[in-house]
Each structure stands twice: as C-alpha cells, then as structure tokens.
Amino acid sequence: MGKYNLTALRVRQTALSQKAAGKIKRLPQWVDVIGDIPPAQVLVRNQPQQHQLVRQRVKTLPGASKPQVVFETEEKRVKPKKASRMFQPVQIKFEEDQLRKEFFRDHPWELARPRVLVETSGKDYERYDWSRLQQPGKRLDGESVVQRQLWLLNNVPDMTKSAAYDIARREFYRLRLQEDIERRVAAEEAEATGATFGPTRLEIGMELENQEYERWKQWAKMEAQIQEQRAASFTGSALPSSEESAPVDEETEKVPQQV
C-alpha cells in the first residue's frame, strides 16, 4: 500500500504559503472559493446506495370493508460487478419504464410517428387527468397508453398488469380508428369541394422503389456482360448461337441410292 497523496487537498494552503514566502505576487482567484467550499476530506469511497422500486396498488385486504392503498417494495437483485464498475452511480428506474418497453415492443411502428416534444410551460403533465386516455392539448401516442395503464394500476382496486394493459390498449385502438375515419372523411369532403391532393407517402415510396429497381436492372445487365467478357477472355470466344444450332439440310446431303 502506497502513501496517500494529499497534494490536491492542500492546494489552498500551498498557495497561501507561496504568497507569504513571496514566490507569487498575488493569490489566485479561486483561493476564496476553495476556502468557502473545501474539497472532501473523506478518503474512503462508499458504494452507491441501491434504491428500492416502490409500487402503489389499491387492494382489498382481508377484514377491511374498503380497498386500501398498499405500497409494494421490490428488492433489486444484486449482481456481482467488476472492480471498475463498483462505484458507478445506480441507474434511475421507474415503474413505467417496463410498461413503456412492453408497449413499444408490441407496437414498434408507433416509434415512427412524429412526436411533439415542445411544451408550453414545462408543467403540462400537471393538467393531465389519466382517468381517461385522451387528453386536451396532447397528441395521442404510446406514452398516453403507458400513463393510462399506470393510472389504472395505481387507482383501480385489484387491478393486474395484464388487465390494465388490455383496457388501455382497447381504448387506444378505438381512438386511433376514430382518427383514421375522421381523416378519411375530411379528405373525401375536400375532394368533393374541388381540392386536389398530391401523391401519398406510399405512392412516393413505391415510385422511388421502382426507380431504384430500374437503376439496379441496368447495373445488373452491365455486370453480366462484364462477367461474360471476362470468362470469354480466359476460355476463348464461343461459337455464335446460329452456328451451334444450325439444322442439317436434308436436301443438300442426299444419300446415293443403290441400283
């Protein structure tokens, strides 16, 4: 075991000693700051605290007339860590993280929808009431399903995770179907009044795919010709197809008849 190096902890005392001895003309600007906020004197580094995951549930307890709020604690599994990762800070985890992971695993295309991340005051979540899925001023997305499922788990008595997921998902599908119908009806009404729309995203994608296919077909033909020419340079030129498949003329080649 080597000795402790306390040079960094005594940097202020060193600066004051050098000023008193006349080695420096004036003190550095950080001397007063380090005097007000000194560095830590603890030489032993403790491991980060392992936080517990607390869940709120409403359950009907035996002997109770009304459902009561119960806080469930889930102990984290302690995994052996490497020495280099022993003092890393603990990851911050919430209950809705797992709910969000399951929803987007079942609905991966929801991540492709555009999202609005700008908030008016930064506290828009305080005005949301997740007793219903659709919120005023918020676009319907996967996060709405996650928050709705979490509200059901925290407020409905004896609610299970799968049942809350089915309820929130059913409401989400119904609202999405309603949005699609409204969008289709609005487009039909606009076309009836003379509006014209350009190609859809699907049509644009198909056109780009066709162009790419035609470009690839031309490239494939050129590559095939290059390969044939390269093979012919090593094996010799092949006979034309007309000479190879020329039929034998029976009239020119007559067998003499015997007398």
UniProtKB/Swiss-Prot annotation:
Q: Which domain of life is it from?
A: Eukaryota
Q: Does the keyword Disulfide bond apply?
A: no
Question: Which InterPro entries does its entry note?
Answer: Ribosomal_mS23_fun (IPR016939)
GO MF annotations in UniProt: structural constituent of ribosome
Q: Does the keyword Ligase apply?
A: no
Kindly state one GO CC term assigned in the UniProt record.
Answer: mitochondrial small ribosomal subunit
Comp. bias (Polar residues): 230-244
Taking the record's annotation, the residue ranges forming a coiled coil are none
**Keyword terms, alphabetized:** Mitochondrion, Ribonucleoprotein, Ribosomal protein
Renumbered to this chain, region (Disordered) spans 230-259
What is its subcellular localisation?
Answer: Mitochondrion
Q: Which family does it belong to?
A: Belongs to the mitochondrion-specific ribosomal protein mS23 family.
Oligomer status and interactors: Component of the mitochondrial small ribosomal subunit.
Protein's recorded name: Small ribosomal subunit protein mS23
Q: Which gene encodes it?
A: rsm25
